[in-house]
């Protein structure tokens, strides 16, 4: 399953003479301990196919993987002993086999992030789950409770959608559709709609999410065994949670400003009291899928760069065969395909609502009657105190709408940029393959190179795309930017014509009136 075959076998006698020439790649890590290929023996069946009998050889990566995959008898006896507790048995039956053996894997490092997801009822997953045949009544009860928790989160966001719709219709009835308060309410009302879609989609993609975690765990184990490296997940998690804290406290500060500016009092309404926690959580629901998608793209790019660095060192000394590199490249493409299976519908929906919010904002700003300074005029509300309070309320809604517009811009930029960088980094692997000097068996090398090239031609099937509608490339990003800029320039041009050329607009109004056919007298 893991044909990590060296191109040459180094004998033990010659290893001591050239010890200074060995790279750091000759070292690995197994169960938390360093091992050296110079001080180990291969399995008998592997030796028979690699070197003549009786030759002392170093331990290959295949033998190391087989050793890691072999369960320690001492631990097995401990877990299967009659006196073993339930925690040990549950640990032994873990979904990800390498997690309970102490081997590093991505799913174990992401436990804190997955726990946060379970609290927010999105992307349900667990790294310690029994098989379906061995589920007991306790696990079934937990599953039922979690499903109810997801339904409760959907109902909460549905209630917020209903309340926002009532406020939207109230502003539309009093001030019109293109009023500042109406447009701001429409923009802020997209937040619970997005949350409902994210919660429902993550529940539907439960199996795909589990498959993604298992796939990236397998790639991580292979790369740790072959190259002795692993992604700096502690740094990635720190950046992830630090970004969430910024989003959380920015929404909380804006809510406190709204509470003080509008003169609200604690205890008047339970929804107002709960909004100090509810509003920041709504913002987290919006941003977490984007950050999670970005995290997986960072991991994929890390494995791609590791493979490229190893290929670039092949000019000095051949360590691995092209078949080995192709197998690792295939594993990376499997991770990208699994990422797309989980996030593709979410990417399409995120780009859709982001463009909708931006276009609605630009259309509102291009209206000649739109004003942000005095949204409630004396002609609309004659009472000065009520008008002042309404102006403050609408200005707060403008701030929330601007907050959502910033989120929309971040979604467009991050989705396009991270997908573009992942696709370009993946293509650099083929460039590194083409720079490798062919070995003695040139025909086999040519075949492996053709496999690389053919696999890369099908990148639209497994690469970073938007539900295979279009790939995430530089052209995609610049196309979206050009569409938004062109739309805004046209709208603002029409606004200038309507303001600076009233006779023209009056003539157009007369022309439109005369163009309407008058009904014949009965």
Curated annotation (Swiss-Prot):
One Pfam family, short name: 7tm_7
Chief location: membrane
Task: Supply one GO BP term.
Answer: egg-laying behavior
Knockout consequence?
Similar number of unlaid eggs as wild-type animals.
UniProt GO cellular component terms: axon; dendrite; membrane; neuronal cell body
Q: Look up keyword Transcription regulation and say if it applies.
A: no
| Organs and tissues of expression | Expressed in some neurons in the head, the HSN neurons and the PVQ interneurons of the tail.
Indicate where this protein resides in the cell. Answer: Membrane
This protein's superkingdom? Eukaryota
Alphabetized UniProt keyword annotations: Membrane, Receptor, Transmembrane, Transmembrane helix
Q: Which residues cross the membrane?
A: 140-160, 184-204, 238-258, 276-296, 345-365, 398-418, 472-492
Q: How does it sit in the membrane?
A: Multi-pass membrane protein
The reply on keyword Transmembrane helix is yes
Molecular function via GO: G protein-coupled receptor activity
* Its job: Orphan receptor. Regulates egg-laying probably by activating guanine nucleotide-binding protein goa-1, in the hermaphrodite-specific neurons (HSNs).
The UniProt similarity line reads: Belongs to the G-protein coupled receptor family.
| Protein name in the entry | Probable G-protein coupled receptor egl-47
């Amino acid at each position: 399953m893991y044909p990590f075959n060296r191109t040459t076998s180094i004998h033990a006698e010659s290893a001591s003479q050239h010890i200074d020439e060995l790279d750091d790649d000759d070292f690995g890590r197994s169960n938390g301990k360093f091992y050296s290929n110079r001080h180990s023996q291969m399995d008998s069946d592997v030796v028979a196919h690699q070197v003549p009998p009786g030759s002392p050889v170093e331990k290959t990566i295949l033998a190391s993987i087989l050793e890691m995959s072999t369960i320690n008898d001492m631990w097995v006896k401990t877990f299967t002993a009659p006196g073993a507790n339930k925690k040990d048995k549950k640990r032994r039956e873990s979904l990800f086999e390498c997690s309970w053996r102490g081997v590093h894997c991505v799913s174990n490092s992401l436990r804190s992030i997955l726990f946060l997801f379970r609290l927010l009822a999105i992307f349900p997953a667990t790294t310690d789950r029994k098989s379906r045949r061995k589920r007991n009544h306790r696990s079934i009860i937990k599953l039922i409770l979690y499903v109810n928790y997801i339904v409760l989160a959907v109902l909460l966001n549905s209630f917020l959608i209903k309340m926002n719709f009532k406020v939207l219709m109230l502003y539309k009835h009093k001030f019109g559709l293109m009023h500042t308060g109406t447009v701001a309410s429409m923009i802020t009302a997209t937040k619970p709609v997005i949350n409902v879609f994210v919660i429902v989609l993550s529940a539907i993609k439960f199996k795909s999410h589990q498959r993604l975690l298992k796939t990236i765990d397998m790639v991580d184990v292979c790369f740790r065994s072959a190259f002795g490296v692993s992604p700096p997940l502690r740094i990635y998690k720190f950046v992830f949670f630090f970004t969430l804290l910024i989003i959380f406290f920015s929404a909380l500060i804006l809510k406190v400003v709204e509470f003080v500016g509008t003169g609200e009092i604690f205890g008047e309404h339970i929804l107002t009291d709960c909004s100090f926690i509810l509003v920041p959580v709504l913002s987290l629901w919006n941003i977490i899928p984007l950050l999670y998608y970005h995290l997986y793209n960072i991991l994929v790019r890390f494995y791609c760069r590791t493979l490229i660095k190893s290929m670039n060192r092949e000019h000095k000394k051949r360590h691995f065969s092209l078949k080995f590199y192709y197998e690792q490249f295939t594993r990376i493409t499997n991770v990208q395909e699994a990422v797309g299976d989980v996030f593709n519908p979410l990417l399409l929906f995120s780009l859709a609502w982001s463009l909708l919010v931006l276009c609605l904002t630009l259309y509102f700003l291009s209206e000649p009657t739109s004003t942000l300074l005095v949204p409630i005029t004396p002609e609309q509300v004659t009472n000065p105190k009520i008008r002042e309070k309404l102006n403050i309320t609408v200005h707060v809604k403008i701030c929330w709408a601007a907050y959502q517009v910033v989120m929309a811009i971040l979604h467009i930029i991050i989705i396009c940029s991270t997908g573009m960088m992942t696709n370009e980094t993946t293509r650099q692997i083929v460039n590194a393959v083409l720079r490798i000097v062919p070995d003695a068996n040139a025909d086999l090398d040519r075949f492996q190179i053709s496999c690389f090239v053919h696999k890369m031609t099908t990148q639209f099937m497994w690469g970073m795309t938007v539900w295979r509608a279009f790939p995430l490339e530089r052209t995609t990003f610049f196309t979206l930017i050009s569409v938004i800029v062109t739309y805004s320039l046209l709208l603002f041009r029409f606004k200038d014509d309507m303001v600076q050329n009233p006779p023209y607009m009056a003539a157009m109004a007369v022309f439109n009136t005369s163009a309407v056919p008058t009904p014949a007298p009965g």
